[in-house]
Design a protein with these regions (language model features):
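Transmembrane alpha-helical segments of polytopic membrane transport and secretion proteins
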Residues: 1-12, 233-247
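Hydrophobic alpha-helical transmembrane segments of multipass integral membrane proteins
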Residues: 5, 9, 13-17, 52, ...
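Periplasmic/extracellular loop-to-transmembrane helix junction in inner-membrane transport proteins
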Residues: 23-70, 207
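Loop-to-helix entry region at the N-terminal start of transmembrane alpha-helices
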Residues: 53-61, 111-131, 171, 176, ...
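Cytoplasmic-entry segments and transmembrane alpha-helices of multi-pass inner-membrane transporters
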Residues: 75-111, 134-143, 149
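Glycine-rich helix-loop "coupling/hinge" segments at transmembrane-helix boundaries
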Residues: 110-112, 140, 188-224, 243, ...
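Transmembrane alpha-helices
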Residues: 122, 126, 159-192, 219, ...
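Short cytoplasmic-facing helical segments at TM-TM junctions of multi-pass membrane proteins
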Residues: 135, 139-175
């Protein structure tokens, strides 16, 4: 209870300082709107239909890109974690591609797919791929070798059976940590994917900023924060259910 009260107090102080800065003229309100300006801007966006349209588009990009990126990342991470030959084969490919930031792929996404939904999905998928890949690879590699030897002694000689019975359950906590990190990273990638003209929250933020409608920009920033909070809460619940055997 004490921690909750402190958290609420900290939030109230933050909001109060935020409101005071533009009201006292320390910063032009057109550059930094106070919290009191956000609800009217939100209601205006909802009434115009722009908010719902943007949220729907971004959720479509987010879910598709996240699914593609995490699916490939988990699959390849598990394979390279299980087999030394696969890790060796991909070692230099990983070293070359890993340092390239997701934003660097934007020009290629536009060239290959145009300013379109596939381009946004590609950028988001690239943005989360490496996080999940290394999480899965590291989690599989960290599995106790004694467990693998015991599995082989009990007849689990095929890679698929070892994966199903030993490796995946043991590596699940590490993989899920990577997936949770990817949830937040994907929202960052959504903005990068949409600021170049693809319909969604990022595009709407850029349109608003070009008109100095900073209150609208904040509306969409908070919308992303709220959506991430919902996804993260749902994922933590799912994670607890999947790992209930550890309790």
């Amino acid at each position: 209870m004490r921690l909750l009260l402190l958290s609420c107090l900290g939030l109230l102080i933050f909001l109060g300082l935020w409101e005071a800065v533009p009201r006292l003229g320390l910063v032009n309100s057109a550059m930094l709107p106070g919290p009191s300006a956000i609800p009217p801007a939100f209601l205006k966006e909802v009434a115009s239909g722009a908010w719902l349209t943007s949220v729907t588009s971004s959720l479509s990009h987010y879910i598709t890109g996240l699914s593609v990126g995490t699916g490939l990342g988990v699959a390849l991470g598990i394979v390279t974690g299980m087999y030394r030959s696969a890790e060796g084969f991909t070692a230099w490919i990983v070293r070359v591609l890993r340092p390239i930031p997701g934003l660097a792929w934007v020009p290629f996404a536009i060239i290959w797919f145009g300013v379109s939904t596939p381009a946004a999905v590609f950028i988001i998928a690239v943005g989360v791929f490496w996080i999940v890949y290394f999480a899965a690879h590291g989690a599989v590699r960290a599995v106790d070798r004694d467990l693998v030897e015991v599995a082989e002694a009990f007849g689990f000689h095929s890679g698929l059976r070892r994966l199903q019975k030993i490796l995946l359950p043991a590596a699940a906590p590490g993989i899920l940590v990577g997936l949770r990190t990817a949830l937040g990273q994907a929202w960052m990638a959504v903005v990068a994917a949409e600021i170049f003209g693809v319909s969604g929250l990022g595009q709407r933020m850029m349109q608003a900023s070009s008109l100095l409608a900073t209150d609208v920009v904040v509306v969409y920033m908070l919308t992303m924060a709220a959506l991430y909070g919902l996804f993260d809460t749902a994922f933590v619940t799912l994670q607890g259910w999947l790992l209930r055997w550890k309790a």
